[in-house]
Each structure stands twice: as C-alpha cells, then as structure tokens.
Amino acid sequence: MLISIATGLGMQYEIKNKISAFNGDISIYNFQTTNYENSSIPLDFDEDLYTNISNINGVVSVQKIATKFGLVRTKKDFDGVYFKGVDQNYNWEKIKRFLIEGNFPNISNSISNQIIISKLLANRLNLEVGDSFQMLFSRNSESSAIRKFEITGIFSSGFNELDS
C-alpha cells in the first residue's frame, strides 16, 4: 500500500512539473478573452505590471507569450495545432530536458521563422529537424495568414495532452 501511494504521488508531481514547464504556473489573460475564440486578445503589458509581478515573493520569471490556433500544412498532409509564440527573453530552461533533437529557435527582435514541434506532430506529418512547413492562421478578415516555418528542434514531454 505504501509503495502505491508513493508511486501515485511521484506520478502526480511529474505531471504537474511537465504542465508547468510548458504552460507556466499562472497565466494572465485579458479580461475580454473568451473560451470560444481561437486566440487571446493581447494584454497591455507595461513595465509597471512586469515589475509588480516580478517583485512578488516566489516569482522566478515572467514570460510574455502569444497563442493562436492554426493548421500545419505539408505537401501531403495537415493537422490542427495550438501555436505558442515567444519573445527573445523567453526562458527555455524548464523545457530543456524535453528537447530530444536539434536546438531551440534563435529568437531576436525581428520576426523568426524558426520553430520547435513535438515528436508526436513530427511523426504524424513525417517531419524532422531542418524541414519547413506552412502554417495557416485565421484572421478576422476572410483570408488566412500563411507563414512558413523551419523546424530547429523536436521535443517530447511524454504526455500526449501536451504534445498533441
């Protein structure tokens, strides 16, 4: 009985750490963002807000991200994905242990076309490090935004809900 409790607690701890590594411990969204939208409305993130959050006891880092749903399109297939964009200050340390091939993207002040994808997505679409693909994002207008990305790395959390 003691072994099963310890195993259960260890598994629970590992799942929590994986979710935290990819999604953070706390997420702050614009109040106007609703669940049915395919992306979040940007939060007006000024320096005072950043400083106030950073000064809270226990806060290690504050990361700005952008999220959007879209379609990955290759020459032979496509798949829907949840896209997460980061800036040049993003801290890759928490997810470093999940990178199984390649490198993290080189992010600078300019728009980057480099991306990491999950092993699960790479297998489904027959993609590997160095390959390129198109990503289609919906916009408020009738036309879609199309961007081309190059895969610099592949990760695997071992947790299908995160890798899908």
Language-model-derived ranges and their functions:
Residues 1-5:
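Hydrophobic membrane-insertion alpha-helices, especially the h-region
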Residues 6-82, 106-110:
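Hydrophobic, regular-secondary-structure patches
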Residues 34, 88-90, 157:
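Active-site/binding-pocket entry motifs
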Residues 37, 73, 94, 144, ...:
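Generic domain-boundary/flexible-linker signal
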Residues 66, 81-86, 103-164:
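Hydrophobic secondary-structure segments that place a key small or acidic residue at a functional site
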Residues 90-98:
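Cytochrome P450 core scaffold surrounding the K-helix E-X-X-R motif
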